[in-house]
Swiss-Prot record:
Stated name of the protein: ATP-dependent RNA helicase FAL1
The reaction(s) this protein catalyses: ATP + H2O = ADP + phosphate + H(+)
Segments forming domain Helicase C-terminal: 238-399
Limits of the Helicase ATP-binding domain: 57-227
This protein's domain notes: The Q motif is unique to and characteristic of the DEAD box family of RNA helicases and controls ATP binding and hydrolysis.
Principal cellular location given in the protein's record: nucleus
Subcellular location: Nucleus, Nucleolus
Biological function: ATP-dependent RNA helicase involved in 40S ribosomal subunit biogenesis. Required for the processing and cleavage of 35S pre-rRNA at sites A0, A1, and A2, leading to mature 18S rRNA.
Lineage summary: Eukaryota, Fungi, Dikarya, Ascomycota, Saccharomycotina
Source species, domain of life: Eukaryota
Pfam families documented for this protein: DEAD, Helicase_C
Similarity section: Belongs to the DEAD box helicase family. DDX48/FAL1 subfamily.
Keyword check for Ribonucleoprotein: no
Length: 399
């Protein structure tokens, strides 16, 4: 794991009201963490805490309910993972921490981060996700898992089957909370919460926290500490954003092909709004002899895992996906995101383009728009206090 771009991370400003009185820890040593955890942090590649880590880790360790917001790629996963690992009793094999995520890929990724950070602590962790045989979960849970990372549907299933014992869970983490609190997951999260001990600590984490999400968190949290980014700081300053005006929807494909002839990139992600469009675009690109892979929520989990692993290893260069990939998935080499379709909601814009500038690295986002999209693009600019420029004629100037 590469280190952060310190200059970029230092630009992040937190709301004074929300962080008043919170001590900022400039080093991991000053947090007095377990020696084996500290060893795991350094082995993972961290040297000094990022802005969110320096503020939120100790709040989580203190046992307070915590609401933490920061940009994509600034180490949010490690923030709650470190806080959680510090309070785990390694002598007990009971489940003590539960992490809920909106996508299977994100749940697996979090499990991997926890595994690496807890490498020297002999931590047992399992990803509990749909799309796989529940028998595998039952077997793993019977062996004893101190930390479970999962998607709400499968987690509530194993709780109801009594395979996942909840009596010793100390901390519940809701990652990408804005997505989790949408209709599909809300009821499942309430259901899970009802099975947890009344004393459970709740940690809410997301890159964006709209007012309605903050209102919903009040049902789960008691006097939470809020570590929130200033509204005008919720932008990705390390990412250059452009748009290409296409007269009609069917001109987008030719524009995309033209872009590919000119761009020299390591890896790229192209986002479409529907599974149908993903399949169509992947087929069209392959007909033009472009090497691409496609991923969406209707695929079997094994197929999704295989595509993700290939993409992570760099075996495939271009991934076409729906928003299933936009949430928190960390592939270091991605330097370009193309929105073939603009996202249907403002919150997903930052999640999508954040894939191109992980951990402070520079990235580029290109939006293909028709005249019908102009108003939406202007709304995104206003919402994120950012400027999306028209792409210059010479594409190499922007890469």
């Amino acid at each position: 794991m590469d280190d952060f771009d310190r200059d970029l991370d230092n630009e992040l400003e937190f709301s004074h009201k929300s962080t008043k009185g919170i001590k900022v820890h400039r080093t991991f040593e000053s947090m007095n963490l377990k020696p084996d955890l500290l060893k795991g942090i350094y082995a993972y590649g961290f040297e000094t805490p990022s802005a969110i880590q320096s503020r939120a880790i100790m709040q989580i360790i203190s046992g307070r309910d915590t609401i933490a917001q920061a940009q994509s790629g600034t180490g949010k996963t490690a923030t709650f993972s470190i806080g959680m690992l510090e309070v785990i009793d390694t002598k007990s094999k009971e489940c003590q921490a539960l992490i809920l995520s909106p996508t299977r890929e994100l749940a697996i990724q979090i499990q991997n981060v926890v595994k690496h950070l807890g490498d020297y602590m002999n931590i047992h962790t399992h990803a509990c996700i749909g799309g796989k045989n529940v028998g595998e979960d039952v077997k793993k849970l019977q062996q004893g898992q101190q930390i479970v990372s999962g998607t709400p549907g499968r987690v509530i299933d194993v709780i109801k089957r009594r395979n996942l014992q909840t009596r010793n869970i100390k901390v519940l983490i809701l990652d990408e909370a804005d997505e989790l609190f949408t209709k599909g997951f809300k009821e499942q999260i309430y259901e899970i919460y009802k099975h947890l001990p009344p004393s459970v600590q709740v940690v809410v984490v997301s890159a964006t926290l709209p007012r309605e999400v903050l209102e919903m968190t009040s049902k789960f949290t008691t006097d939470p500490v809020k570590i929130l980014v200033k509204r005008d700081e919720i932008s990705l300053s390390g990412i250059k954003q452009y748009y290409v005006q296409c007269e009609r929807e069917d001109w987008k494909f030719d524009t995309l092909c033209d872009l590919y002839d000119n761009l020299t990139i390591t890896q790229a992600v192209i986002f479409c709004n529907t599974k149908l469009k993903v399949n169509w675009l992947a087929d069209q690109m392959k007909k033009q002899n472009f090497t691409v892979v496609a991923m969406h929520g209707d695929m079997k989990q094994d197929e999704r895992d295989s595509i993700m692993n290939d993409f992570r290893r760099g075996n495939s260069r271009v991934l076409i996906s729906t928003d299933v990939w936009a949430r928190g998935i960390d592939v270091q080499q991605v330097s370009l995101v193309i929105n073939y379709d603009l996202p249907t909601d403002k919150e997903n814009y930052i999640h999508r383009i954040g894939r191109s500038g992980r951990f402070g690295r520079k990235g580029t986002a290109i939006n293909l728009i028709t005249k019908d999209d102009v108003v939406t693009l202007k709304e995104f600019e206003k919402y994120y206090s950012t400027k999306i420029k028209e792409m210059p004629m010479n594409i190499n100037d922007i890469m």
